[in-house]
Amino acid sequence: MAKLYFLLCLALVACLTMATEEMPALCHLQPDVPKCRGYFPRYYYNPEVGKCEQFIYGGCGGNKNNFVSFEACRATCIIPL
């Protein structure tokens, strides 16, 4: 029984450690959408709501919080529990 309790505690600590893992700094950048002539649907991570959202990228400037797909945004910025 003591071994089972120890393993459960160990699993809990491992889960908490993974859940508090920090996301990359780029995920905290505000979307930078300069006025350019392109029209490219992209995704950025919105830390205020904790999810990836779509925006229109004009094709120039910007920052690294700019993902080609929703999946790429999630894979980079959303830490699984």
Swiss-Prot record:
Chief site of localization? secreted
List, alphabetically, the CDD domains matched: Kunitz-type (cd00109)
User: GO cellular component terms?
Assistant: extracellular space; nematocyst
Q: For the BPTI/Kunitz inhibitor domain, which residue ranges apply?
A: 27-77
Q: Which cysteines are joined by disulfide bonds?
A: 27-77, 36-60, 52-73
Residues with site note (Reactive bond for trypsin): 37-38
Q: Which InterPro entries match?
A: Kunitz_BPTI (IPR002223), Kunitz_BPTI_sf (IPR036880), Prtase_inh_Kunz-CS (IPR020901), TFPI/VKTCI-like (IPR050098)
Subcellular localization: Secreted; Nematocyst
Per UniProt, which keywords does this protein have? Disulfide bond, Ion channel impairing toxin, Nematocyst, Potassium channel impairing toxin, Protease inhibitor, Secreted, Serine protease inhibitor, Signal, Toxin, Voltage-gated potassium channel impairing toxin
Q: Name one GO molecular function term.
A: toxin activity
Tell me the SUPFAM superfamilies matching this sequence: BPTI-like (SSF57362)
Q: Give the signal peptide range.
A: 1-19
What Pfam families does the record point to?
Kunitz_BPTI
Tell me its family: Belongs to the venom Kunitz-type family. Sea anemone type 2 potassium channel toxin subfamily.
What job does the chain carry out?
Dual-function toxin that inhibits both the serine protease trypsin and voltage-gated potassium channels (Kv).
The protein's name is: KappaPI-stichotoxin-Shd2a
Organism this protein belongs to: Stichodactyla haddoni (Saddle carpet anemone)
Q: What is the lineage of its organism?
A: Eukaryota, Metazoa, Cnidaria, Anthozoa, Hexacorallia
